[in-house]
């Protein structure tokens, strides 16, 4: 059993990875701030695809991953899938330079962690 960190694990792609690894028996840690447009997730019991209460090896941190990276000293993580990003696609990239700067900040915190 591996310990897997998934940032952005509440997003469309992330929650599919979460379920995949949970079904394989791995310990999964998700860090996600549940941004608007994520799909109406209730962190405690409203996840599409699975019910968090069905898995003892699931841990969810409802926060910006930058804060989690700054605080976490967990070096026992076997794999990290960094999927956290600002939600909005091409429109955000082309029309909101501040959101792009936020995305770069998120990535920077990941690589420094």
Task: Give a label for each model feature.
Residues 1-113:
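N-terminal Rossmann-like NAD(P)+-binding domain of SDR-like oxidoreductases, especially those catalyzing
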